[in-house]
Each structure stands twice: as C-alpha cells, then as structure tokens.
Amino acid sequence: SANDVALQIAEQIGGSVDGFVQMMNNRAVELGCTNTVFTNPTGLPDDNQHTTAHDMALIMQAAIQNESFRTIAAATSYTIPATNKAAARNLTSKFTMTDTGSTGFYEGCIGGKEGYTEASGSTLVCAAQRNGMTLISVVLKGASGQTAPDAASILNYGFDQFVTLSLGDSDFSIISGGDVVVPAGTGADSLTTEDSQNGDQIDRTYLFNGTSVGSAVLEVVQSD
C-alpha cells in the first residue's frame, strides 16, 4: 500500500507525521465525522485509531469532489519516467473493481481502496457513477476475497432502488445544486423544502420524509 509514500507525503505537507495526523483529524471534524480518530497516515493498527463506515463514506464523498483525486483513483496504470538513475517503470493498479480483467470489475467504478490487517479484517471503500448518480460503498470487517462482491451488491441495491431528480422552479434560478437522490418512483411533489435567506440568495434544503436528500442555492427570478 506504499506506506512509505504516505509517510513522505505526511512530512512534506504537515511538516511532520504528527503534524499531518493533526490535519487529518481536523479535516475529519470539518467533514462531520463524529467517530473517527487518526493516529497515523498509513491506516496500520493502533489502539487509539478508529473510524466507522459512515465516516469513511463522508471522507470518500469529499475526496471524489477533487478532480485530481478522481483521475488518480481511476487510473489502472502509470509509467514513472526514466531518470539518469533508472529506466522507466510501469506500475499497475491492483484495485479489483477498476481492473477490467478481474472478476470483481464493476462498470462505472470511479476508484477506491482495498485493505487488510488482522485488526480490521478485509475492507473496501469505493465510489461508482451510473446514469448521473454517484454512490459510495463501504465494507468493513469483511471476509477475505468477499469485499468486492459485497461492495458491488451495495452499489447495485443503490442504483436499483434510488434515482436522481433534477429540480427547478419558475420563480427561482438555481445557482448550484438542485439534484436530489430519492427512492425510485418518488416524484418532486413528495418533497418538502426548508429555506433560509442568505443575502440576495436563498439556501434551500430538500427533504423526503423529514430526511435531507439534497440542497440548492437559489436566486429570485426578476419578472419584466
């Protein structure tokens, strides 16, 4: 898992491994992770380090907003250019769900990470996109060789049971957002909204049965 690289990145960005770990924990809090504590950047076992499937999903949700991350996560191979010390070297990704030659290949998978330690068991976090909807799957404490099929089952359930609605309003112009994920067969008339004024704009939250399913920033349309 290139943990040597993880440590080098930590020192480069955080000034030290401990400094980077503090940055990791601060960012986790910003993302809404309430049950995560990092003690190292490698993921190797530590009695004081822990997380949950929900928190891992929040972290993955933030990660895939970064285009550079998506490009790297989706890459199946990379060539390290030659230097005056070594010839070019080819690296091949071993991530099952983006490997077209693997039985675990999943159409639409953006990327992800598999892992294993005795303490955590087999784990897998991934994201996939189909028909304009992106879903995240997290498998923790899985059985050996079973995490990719389990992740695929979770994603299949999501894509089969939920749809994305793009909402509009004749009285408002949507500046950002406006897409919601709801159970299949649900119409816009099943949603309720909560609005808050933010200067000249309106921050709108869409709810389904009291649960937030999306948001939008709106601007009032001025009539002639």
Regions found by a protein language model. Name each.
Residues 1-54, 58-67, 130:
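Active-site-adjacent loops and short helices of periplasmic peptidoglycan-processing enzymes
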Residues 33-34, 47-224:
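Domain-terminus/edge residues, biased toward the C-terminal soluble/receptor-binding domains
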